[in-house]
Amino acid sequence: MATENVGTVVQIIGPVIDIRFERGKLPSIYNAIKINSEGIDIVAEVMQYTGNDTVRCVSMNSTDGLKRGMKAVDTGEPIKVPVGKEVLGRVFNVLGEPIDGKGDVKATTYLPIHREAPGLDEQKPVTEILETGIKVIDLLAPYAKGGKIGLFGGAGVGKTVLIMELIRNIATEHGGYSVFTGVGERSREGNDLWNEMNESGVIEKTALVFGQMNEPPGSRMRVGLTGLTMAEYFRDELGQDVLLFIDNIFRFIQAGSEVSALLGRIPSAVGYQPTLATEMGALQERITSTKKGSITSVQAVYVPADDLTDPAPATTFTHLDATTVLSRHIVEQGIYPAVDPLDSTSRVLDRRIVGDEHYTVARKVQEILQRYKELQDIIAILGLDELSEEDKLIVFRARKIQRFLSQPFFVAEAYTGYKGKFVRIKDTIRGFKEIIEGKMDDIPEAAFYMAGTIDEVYERAKKM
């Protein structure tokens, strides 16, 4: 057995640790370093060389109690985490250690969290829609199977609830595996999600990885890679179509910014790290469809101060196939999910992929909503009566469309009092087609609110 490469802790600045090794024995960048003495058990990752014999590392755990002079051992490899079916139904931290109190994981395979993205010859273009059962998404900004989707929104507009609904729908309707990665979000939400999944039985097909708000920046920066590594194994070795949820990708950037400052790098625009685009690219390029399987990724993106031009959301935009924008203006109207039908976009809303009928209905719906938006100023100043008959009709149809875009969620039944609905794409298209063709003109607006299919609207209207 080779002798251990042992170093000594020489400096500690918060989560950043400088470790001195013998000359010629410096560990490689990204190697995991273990510090295990005097009741301290820390794993750190090598980030940079600061001299001929010293490496600067970022700790994945709290550095409380760490002292200069403590021994540190180079493991000779990056952080490795368990993969395979054994991780389903369990909760892990960034190091792949179970944190759900259910004992050890019986995994036989462990993989490093730092890996190359699949080569161009292994990748597969995506032209298939993933049916989510959520009307506003399936109609106006459909998700591509194996695509990357961004959920954009400020604080408290419903990003996490939408993610929970997607996990529930994919597990129960498609029977696929999901990996949920909680990056720098509230522990309470993680606990809610865990309890929700146990109650609904979804947990059996999901692995959860958490590096929450109270964790050091090193943990929050790497936890996304831990979840991604588990998802990659399902794709590459088991040939699965996997769903990878990242809540919240902004916190990954934020943690990178903290680490960058601690490492002494000069900040870039708005104080972000100069390596922002590189770090984001390294993570996003691994999320892709290959000839073996696919990873469809849904990433919640917190938008600081609702400013979409901030470098963090702006860098994320470049990697996405679809964007689901959640709007505070729609929340104020009491319409949930608060997806903005005009701001949300998708690369697969294309005649060649979704077909003529879907494309035509979607564009007509957006056209009516856009015209209604333009008319709102006139209505505010002159009143509804000053509009032409044609414009009045557009306003009435637009208001029905807005209400029909709302939908009761399974995971929010306790809050809304409405039973959750999963709506097939064909029913969604049929419903909106009837509204835009004028077949629903004599039905009151209230019948459309929180309805599933158009048939339910007819039933409600009869009782009114």
UniProtKB/Swiss-Prot annotation:
Q: Superkingdom of this entry's organism?
A: Bacteria
UniProt-annotated location(s): Cell membrane
EC code(s) of this entry:
7.1.2.2
The record lists ATP as bound by 153-160
Quickly give the catalysed reaction: ATP + H2O + 4 H(+)(in) = ADP + phosphate + 5 H(+)(out)
Q: Which Pfam families match?
A: ATP-synt_ab, ATP-synt_ab_N, ATP-synt_VA_C
The record's Gene Ontology cellular component field reads: plasma membrane; proton-transporting ATP synthase complex
For this protein, the record's SUPFAM superfamilies field holds:
C-terminal domain of alpha and beta subunits of F1 ATP synthase, N-terminal domain of alpha and beta subunits of F1 ATP synthase, P-loop containing nucleoside triphosphate hydrolases
Which molecular function GO terms apply here?
A: ATP binding; ATP hydrolysis activity; proton-transporting ATP synthase activity, rotational mechanism
Q: How does the record classify its membrane topology?
A: Peripheral membrane protein
Question: Does Cell division appear among the keywords?
Answer: no
Record-linked SMART domains: AAA
Say which family it is in.
Belongs to the ATPase alpha/beta chains family.
What is the stated purpose of this protein? Answer: Produces ATP from ADP in the presence of a proton gradient across the membrane. The catalytic sites are hosted primarily by the beta subunits.
NCBIfam families tied to this protein: atpD
Matching HAMAP family: ATP_synth_beta_bact
* Quaternary structure annotation from Swiss-Prot or TrEMBL: F-type ATPases have 2 components, CF(1) - the catalytic core - and CF(0) - the membrane proton channel. CF(1) has five subunits: alpha(3), beta(3), gamma(1), delta(1), epsilon(1). CF(0) has three main subunits: a(1), b(2) and c(9-12). The alpha and beta chains form an alternating ring which encloses part of the gamma chain. CF(1) is attached to CF(0) by a central stalk formed by the gamma and epsilon chains, while a peripheral stalk is formed by the delta and b chains.
Q: What is the protein's given name?
A: ATP synthase subunit beta
